[in-house]
């Protein structure tokens, strides 16, 4: 039976009452709201109190409080992180050292030095000052390579790789190195009539092919194909991601990385890892005694004092990156500096061409006798160190005396090569390209040349420095023997190729457009 009108109104009234809070409910809700608001206000107050206390402690009570530096950097790590992510960190350090002096507090618990007196304590102490793990890249297979391994493993790696990077090893590998450099000259000759070339690209191709042959038993084929191998092309993206990854790790948010990292980057890293593994497995299948870096190293199970497969993978990646980037970066920077200083270029060209009667005389041994070339490369290394930031170390328990001042245990310290080598405290006319400073010129007698340590010092100095020097000398000598060089000014524009570069662990090099005019020889052979 249908409800009457009175019954319908009564039902509607009861339904609406469901949404009308009773007096008790209102009181309860007010109580909860007040509690939430009070908790929020208390949280904000606690955060504000913690912030003020932290700021006060770091500025006025912290053991590093007496060291000079910008207040914001002393208060928080955020300005440092911002600088690294933006790629301006090297230039920022240079600016800060010019403003505050030879030692600067660049973070609440970190000091930066630009004086050679700090080098010995930081990099040559016994026991060693450990590397700061927050400044190291993550390892894709969980096994640190030679760049990040603990002392006992680092010593073992160096011992196993020592022969391959020694003078004797270099001479044994000379035919391999020479073959790639001759191919570089051939390819440059073939392309020189097509307009200006990006010389950065060609240097990269040559040095990657050489180190690929030495580290993996075969080159990347860059010079043969005149194009960049996929593995090499991905390096820039991976390296640029390291400062961001390290910033996230510093806040103990490692779990966030897979969630926010671009899928393209994650896939790229996975492909790179697989590529390296395949190359190592291929090298293992060939056995020992191939005349490359792995002779005497291989020990797949890691039971005979050699390297396990996982260690070979980690070290293979590190060797390829360090062994190629160092040489190609310096050659690029040196070429730019020579083109900006035509008198130096002319003198070096005359030096090379006057030292040989035929290109066949130019080899690893003969170029080692070119004193002016050595001075040119040393000066380029000073102004444009391929690894512009030295590794950071942590002061051992008990503290240390660095550059005449006490530094407490746990402090992160480093000597900044770029800032140190451009300091007027260390070099006369520091921003000028003057190779004569390395040739006993009396004008530069007071230069503190030991400041320039582009390959670091101590037990962890660059094991491949002899290879890098040999490559740089031989490549530069061959190019100056065969070609006259000229900057493509219209294509480059007014920009300063060197000073405009950002740094994400390595220099972010833009194209350097150069015209190469083949030299006309009256006789050859």
From Swiss-Prot:
One of its GO terms (molecular function) is averantin hydroxylase activity. Its cofactor is heme. Pfam families: p450 (PF00067). PANTHER family: CYTOCHROME P450 (PTHR24305), CYTOCHROME P450 MONOOXYGENASE ASQL-RELATED (PTHR24305:SF210). Induction: Expression is positively regulated by the dothistromin-specific transcription factor aflR. Averantin hydroxylase; part of the fragmented gene cluster that mediates the biosynthesis of dothistromin (DOTH), a polyketide toxin very similar in structure to the aflatoxin precursor, versicolorin B. The first step of the pathway is the conversion of acetate to norsolorinic acid (NOR) and requires the fatty acid synthase subunits hexA and hexB, as well as the polyketide synthase pksA. PksA combines a hexanoyl starter unit and 7 malonyl-CoA extender units to synthesize the precursor NOR. Keywords: Glycoprotein, Heme, Iron, Membrane, Metal-binding, Monooxygenase, Oxidoreductase, Transmembrane, Transmembrane helix. It is a single-pass membrane protein. Belongs to the cytochrome P450 family. CDD domains: CYP60B-like (cd11058). This is Averantin hydroxylase. Glycans are attached at residue 315. The chain crosses the membrane at residues 36-56. It is found in: Membrane. The lineage of its organism: Eukaryota, Fungi, Dikarya, Ascomycota, Pezizomycotina. Heme binds at residue 462. It catalyses: (1'S)-averantin + reduced [NADPH--hemoprotein reductase] + O2 = (1'S,5'R)-5'-hydroxyaverantin + oxidized [NADPH--hemoprotein reductase] + H2O; (1'S)-averantin + reduced [NADPH--hemoprotein reductase] + O2 = (1'S,5'S)-5'-hydroxyaverantin + oxidized [NADPH--hemoprotein reductase] + H2O + H(+). It is an enzyme of class 1 (oxidoreductase). GO terms for cellular component: membrane. Its EC number is 1.14.14.116.
């Amino acid at each position: 039976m249908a409800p009457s009108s009175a019954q319908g109104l009564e039902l509607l009234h009861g339904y609406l009452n469901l949404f009308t809070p009773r007096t008790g409910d209102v009181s309860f809700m007010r109580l909860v709201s007040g509690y939430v608001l009070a908790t929020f206000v208390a949280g904000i107050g606690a955060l504000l109190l913690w912030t003020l206390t932290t700021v006060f402690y770091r500025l006025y009570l912290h053991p590093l409080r007496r060291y000079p530096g910008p207040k914001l950097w002393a208060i928080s790590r955020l300005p440092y992180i911002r600088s690294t992510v933006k790629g301006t960190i090297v230039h920022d350090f240079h600016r800060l050292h010019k403003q505050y002096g030879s030692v600067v507090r660049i973070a609440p618990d970190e000091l930066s030095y630009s004086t050679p007196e700090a080098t010995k304590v930081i990099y040559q102490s016994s026991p060693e000052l450990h590397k700061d793990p927050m400044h190291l890249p993550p390892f894709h297979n969980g096994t640190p390579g030679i760049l990040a391994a603990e002392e006992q493993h680092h010593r073992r790696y160096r011992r196993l790789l020592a022969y391959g990077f020694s003078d004797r090893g270099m001479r044994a590998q000379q035919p391999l190195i020479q073959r790639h450099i001759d191919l570089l000259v051939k390819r440059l000759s073939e392309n020189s009539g097509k307009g200006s070339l990006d010389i950065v690209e060609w240097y990269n191709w040559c040095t990657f092919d050489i180190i690929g042959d030495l580290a993996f038993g075969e080159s990347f084929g860059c010079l043969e194909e005149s194009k960049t191998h996929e593995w090499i092309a991905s390096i820039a993206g991976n390296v640029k991601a390291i400062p961001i990854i390290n910033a996230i790790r510093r806040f103990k948010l490692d779990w966030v990385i897979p969630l926010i990292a671009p899928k393209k980057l994650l896939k790229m890293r996975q492909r790179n890892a697989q590529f390296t593994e395949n190359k190592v497995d291929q090298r293992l299948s060939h056995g020992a005694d191939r005349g490359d870096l792995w002779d005497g190293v291989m020990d797949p199970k890691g039971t005979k004092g050699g390297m396990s497969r996982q260690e070979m993978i980690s070290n293979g990646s590190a060797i390829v990156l360090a062994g190629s980037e160092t040489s190609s970066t310096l050659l690029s920077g040196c070429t730019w500096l020579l083109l900006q200083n035509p008198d130096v270029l002319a003198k070096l060209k005359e030096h090379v061409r006057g030292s040989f009667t035929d290109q066949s005389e130019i080899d690893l041994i003969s170029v080692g006798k070119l004193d002016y070339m050595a001075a040119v490369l040393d000066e380029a290394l000073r102004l444009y160190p391929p690894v512009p930031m030295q590794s950071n170390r942590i002061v051992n328990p008990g503290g240390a005396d660095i550059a005449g001042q006490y530094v407490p245990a746990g402090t992160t310290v480093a000597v900044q090569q770029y800032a140190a080598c451009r300091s007027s405290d260390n070099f006369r006319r520091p921003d000028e390209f003057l190779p004569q400073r390395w040739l006993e010129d009396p004008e530069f007698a007071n230069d503190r040349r030991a400041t320039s340590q582009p390959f670091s010092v101590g037990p962890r100095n660059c094991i491949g420095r002899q290879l890098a020097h040999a490559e740089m000398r031989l490549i530069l000598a061959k190019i100056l023997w065969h070609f006259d060089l000229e900057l493509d000014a219209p294509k480059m524009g007014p920009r300063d190729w060197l000073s405009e570069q950002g740094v994400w662990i390595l220099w972010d090099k833009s194209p350097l457009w150069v015209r190469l005019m083949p030299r006309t020889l009256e006789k050859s052979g």
